[in-house]
C-alpha cells in the first residue's frame, strides 16, 4: 500500500484473526491489535471529538456515517458506541465508521506516522539512457 505507515485493528471476536494476520505480515511496529474497552474509548474518543471540532478530520457526507456518529452515547462519562446494533438498507451496523475513524487515530497516536521524504537522483557519468 502506498504511504502505509500503520494500522490498528479490532482484535475482539471475528476481527482477532485479521488483526493477528496483519501483525504477522507487517510486524508489531506497523500493525496493532486493539482490544476495545472502556479505557480505550476514554483515551481515543477525545481525539475523535477534537478532530471533528477543529475540522482536521473530514467525514464523508453519507447517511450510514452520519447514523454511526449519531449513535454515540456517553456511558459513565465516556463517549462510546452502544452495545445494540442498528440496521440500514445493507444490513446491520454497529458504529462501523466511528470505530474505523477512532482506530485510525489510535494508529497515528500509538504507531506514529511516516514523515514525507524526497530523494535526489544521482547522475552517472557515461550512462546514456536517451535511447530508451
Predicted regions and their residues:
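RNase H-like, metal-dependent nuclease domains and their acidic two-metal-ion catalytic environment used
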Residues: 1-35, 42, 46, 50, ...
